[in-house]
């Protein structure tokens, strides 16, 4: 394994220059092709045609039966005229919509992409856990040319803390991005310890390295680190992202919590973003108090702020058993829950007791669990919310690093949202008569819009069925497309998908995954220079004070020296 990782690192260095050149050319090429395709006649022989489908484009609210011609990986023509091509998808009676986009997909591995594709997922990112900054470039290079769906990752706040507080710096497993947390979470400093000034600057510099390398944004699991991460540290983390104009996505500070705590956590992320003039993604806010969280987000959008929120259509969540908010003094004493009713082991399909919880935390602290937290009747209501995005929070199944064609019925230990979030969305929409345009906005366009507004060219060309856009497309039966995964069997793929097209290539046809590897990196162009600015007492005083005493430390992520008791937990 170590030999393979070393090879990947060397390979990534060799390829980086070529890929940077390729990325630079994509934007100009895309603009040229948009103007070229506007003049294409229906007599053109296309690479692929999608015939007689109900075309839905959320950005323009277009909804009509049309034929779609695809050439060189882009939508070249949308027409009522007859067209032909080298390959055909008969979409009669089917929906033709933008490929689904997920900003919160942890299972960034070959079989994870396979599960997503069966569910219509053409583009996925991990905007919560992310990847350590120093490993962003090799993370992308390891997937180049061998990945079936589009892939992206944020730079990780949590893993930066693990590197400089728990000593994970330089560990080979960090190249695996979000999956690395199954190793780093065996220690506790990443979640419990407040850094000193030197450590704090190292954490922020590591985040900057990832953004310099093209990470889609900053991912923070502050809700798992509420004791260790001060409000100042969270602000400084978002400030690093703000220097690049990129979003911070966060599992907010008090998730899981009661309605007031949940919204206070969202308010921290949002207030920081507004103060910094930066984008933000309030992740999986479908928790207690979700109506207020949504209202705040929509009101800010109406004022012009690029702030958005994610939901997923499941009443239960999933995490590792040692999550801070699941400790007995919080989950039982404070929130009034019982492990016997709420905490399920997805491998054994048994509920925990206090005794088995304590034993498992001691012996296997990063064991995945399913946690029931909300009424099931709320699942469809979240799908009616204006402007939200689908963030499935898809977690890994075992074996995590299985090949793309590994038998899905042999995968274990995962939440049904990993395989079924999009199928569940369409099924619930069908059962509750939610307009298809709304569902397609949630599943595709809304994420593309918000990420595109951060300057991410990749997303400015996706999430839409329009001439000149990249041909990431799903074709599905609106009456039969559905999820099949359950809490008992979480990795059963969805069915009812006629075709999934990635960058113009059919990757799923009639619910069969094909050996097509057309996935492209969802990534900003790497920057020549870092934008990291170390923090210090002196720089804070010079900016915000006319003569602050030298022992004041309010501007750095260290304990308040005027009130040292504030650092005791």
Give the residues covered by each predicted segment.
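Bacterial N-terminal signal peptides that target proteins for export
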Residues: 2-12
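Bacterial N-terminal signal peptides
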Residues: 11-22
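Active-site microenvironment of metallo-dependent hydrolases
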Residues: 24-66, 71, 80-81, 117-123, ...
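Metal-associated gating/positioning segment near the N- to mid-region
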Residues: 81-86, 90-146
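Histidine-centered catalytic micro-motifs
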Residues: 99-108, 222, 248-254
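Acidic-and-aromatic substrate-binding clefts and catalytic sites of carbohydrate-active enzymes
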Residues: 106, 129-133, 226-230, 256-261, ...
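Alpha-helix-loop-beta-strand connector modules within alpha/beta enzyme cores
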Residues: 146-151, 235-250, 275
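Active-site neighborhoods of metal-dependent hydrolases
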Residues: 155, 161-228, 266-274, 278-443, ...
């Amino acid at each position: 394994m170590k030999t393979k990782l070393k090879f990947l690192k060397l390979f990534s260095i060799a390829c980086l220059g070529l890929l940077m050149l390729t990325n630079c050319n994509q934007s100009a090429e895309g603009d040229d092709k948009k103007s070229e395709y506007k003049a294409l006649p229906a007599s053109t022989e296309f690479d692929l045609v999608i015939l007689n489908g109900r075309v839905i484009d959320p950005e323009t609210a277009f909804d009509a039966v049309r034929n779609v011609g695809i050439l060189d990986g882009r939508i070249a023509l949308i027409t009522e005229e007859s067209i032909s091509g080298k390959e055909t998808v008969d979409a009669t009676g089917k929906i033709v919509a933008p490929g689904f986009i997920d900003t919160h997909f942890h299972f960034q591995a070959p079989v994870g992409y396979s599960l997503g594709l069966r569910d219509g997922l053409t583009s996925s990112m991990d905007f919560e856990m992310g990847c350590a900054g120093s490993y962003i470039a090799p993370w992308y290079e390891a997937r180049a040319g061998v990945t079936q769906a589009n892939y992206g990752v944020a730079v990780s706040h949590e893993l930066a803390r693990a590197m400089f507080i728990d000593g994970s710096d330089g560990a080979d497993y960090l190249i695996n991005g979000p999956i690395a947390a199954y190793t780093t979470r065996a220690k506790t400093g990443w979640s419990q310890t407040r850094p000193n000034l030197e450590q704090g600057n190292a954490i922020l510099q590591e985040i900057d390295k990832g953004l310099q390398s093209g990470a889609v944004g900053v991912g923070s699991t502050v809700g798992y680190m509420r004791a260790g991460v001060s409000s100042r540290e969270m602000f400084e983390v978002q400030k690093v992202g703000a220097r690049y104009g990129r979003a911070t996505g966060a599992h907010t500070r008090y998730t899981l919590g009661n309605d007031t705590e949940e919204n206070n956590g969202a308010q921290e992320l949002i207030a920081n973003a507004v103060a910094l003039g930066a984008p933000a993604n309030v992740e999986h806010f479908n928790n207690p108090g979700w109506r207020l969280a949504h209202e705040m987000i929509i009101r800010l959008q109406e004022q012009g702020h690029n702030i958005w929120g994610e939901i997923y259509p499941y009443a239960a969540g999933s995490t590792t058993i040692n999550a801070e908010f699941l400790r007995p003094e919080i989950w039982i004493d404070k929130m009034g829950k019982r492990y016997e009713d709420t905490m399920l082991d997805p491998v054994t399909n048994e509920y925990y007791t206090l005794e088995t919880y304590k034993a498992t935390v001691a012996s296997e602290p990063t064991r995945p669990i399913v946690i029931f937290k909300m009424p099931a009747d709320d699942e469809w209501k979240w799908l009616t919310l204006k402007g939200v995005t689908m963030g499935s929070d898809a977690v890994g199944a075992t074996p995590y690093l299985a090949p793309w064609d590994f038998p899905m019925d042999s995968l274990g230990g995962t939440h049904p949202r990993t395989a079924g979030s999009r199928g569940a969305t369409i099924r619930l929409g069908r059962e509750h008569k939610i307009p298809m345009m709304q569902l397609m906005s949630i599943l595709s366009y809304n994420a593309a819009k918000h990420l595109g507004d951060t300057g991410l060219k990749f997303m400015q060309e996706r999430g839409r069925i329009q001439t000149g856009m990249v041909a990431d497309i799903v074709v599905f039966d609106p009456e039969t497309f559905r999820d099949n995964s359950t809490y008992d069997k979480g990795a059963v793929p969805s069915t009812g998908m006629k075709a999934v097209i990635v960058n113009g290539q059919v990757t799923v046809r009639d619910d069969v995954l094909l050996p097509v590897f057309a996935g492209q990196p969802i990534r900003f162009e790497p920057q020549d220079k870092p934008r990291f600015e170390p923090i210090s007492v002196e720089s804070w005083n010079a900016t915000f004070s006319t003569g602050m005493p030298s022992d004041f430390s309010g501007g750095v992520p260290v304990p308040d020296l005027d009130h040292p008791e504030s650092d005791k937990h």
